[in-house]
A protein has these predicted regions:
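Structural preference for beta-strand elements that scaffold enzyme active sites
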Residues: 1-3, 53-56, 83-87, 110-114, ...
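An N-terminally biased module of ancient metal coordination in phosphate/nucleic-acid-related enzymes
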Residues: 1-73
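Short aromatic-enriched loop/helix-cap "lid" or pocket-rim segments at secondary-structure transitions
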Residues: 12-19, 98-100, 125-126
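Acidic-and-aromatic substrate-binding clefts and catalytic sites of carbohydrate-active enzymes
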Residues: 34, 61-67, 90-98, 155-162, ...
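Acidic (Asp/Glu)-rich catalytic clusters
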Residues: 43-51, 70-82, 99-111, 135-136, ...
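Glycine-rich phosphate-binding "P-loop"
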Residues: 60-61, 115-133
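A short, structured active-site edge motif that brings together acidic residues
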Residues: 83-93, 97, 114-120
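Catalytic pocket-lining loop regions of alpha/beta-barrel enzymes
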Residues: 129-184
C-alpha cells in the first residue's frame, strides 16, 4: 500500500516560514505540536503500522522549493528500501516556468506539482491564491504539466470546485490528484 500524501521536514535543512512562525494560528489550528522535525524514520514507523510500504511526499511550503525537492530526493536515494517519490511546488504563473520545470525534471524522484489554489478564504485572499484559477498563465501551466507527463495536485476550498473543474477540463492530458478536498 502506498501513502499518497505525506510531509517531511527538517527545520535545520529547509526553511518553512509558515511552520516556523511561533504563535500564529492557521486555518487548520495551532501548528505548535508540529513545529519540530518530522523525518523519514519516524514517518516509516508510523506508516508501517498501517501497512504502507511506499509513499509520495507532497511539498509543504518551503521558502526554496528546489532545496526542498533536492533534500527529499536525497532521502529517496539514501533509502532504496522505501520507495519515495515527490510532488513539488512550482509557480505555474511564472515567466520562467519552462526553465523551472526543466530543472525539476532533472531530479529523479519528482512526479508532479502542487500549487495550492485554496486553503481558507481568509488566507487565500491575503495571498492571492484564490485568483489562480482565473489566471491564463496558471491554466497554461496546468496544461504544460500534462505535456511533460507531470501530474497536478489540487488543493482547494469548496467554493472553487466548479471553477477548478472547468480549468482542468481544458487540460485533459494533465493527471490531477485531489488533495485536502474541501481544505483542510
Amino acid at each position: 500500500m502506498i501513502d499518497a500524501h505525506h510531509h517531511l521536514w527538517d527545520l535545520s535543512k529547509v526553511h518553512y516560514p509558515w511552520l516556523e512562525a511561533k504563535g500564529v494560528v492557521r486555518f487548520f489550528g495551532d501548528p505548535t505540536p508540529i513545529q519540530r522535525n518530522y523525518l523519514l524514520k519516524e514517518f516509516r514507523e508510523n506508516a508501517k503500522v498501517e501497512g504502507f510500504r511506499a509513499s509520495v511526499h507532497i511539498q509543504v511550503g518551503a521558502s526554496d522549493p528546489v532545496a526542498e525537492a533536492m533534500w527529499i530526493d536525497s532521502i529517496a536515494e539514501a533509502n532504496p528500501d522505501w520507495p519515495l517519490v515527490q510532488v513539488v511546488h512550482c509557480d505555474l504563473t511564472s515567466s520562467t516556468l519552462d526553465k523551472d520545470l526543466d530543472l525539476f525534471q532533472t531530479i529523479p524522484s519528482i512526479r508532479g506539482v502542487r500549487q495550492i489554489v485554496g486553503r481558507s478564504s481568509e488566507e487565500d485572499t491575503k495571498s492571492g491564491t484564490n485568483d489562480l484559477l482565473s489566471s491564463s498563465a496558471f491554466c497554461d501551466g496546468i496544461a504544460e504539466l500534462g505535456n511533460r507527463n507531470l501530474s497536478f495536485d489540487l488543493q482547494l476550498t469548496p467554493e472553487l470546485i466548479e471553477q477548478a473543474a472547468n480549468v482542468l477540463s481544458a487540460a485533459p492530458q494533465t493527471k490531477t490528484a485531489l488533495c485536502h478536498a474541501g481544505s483542510p
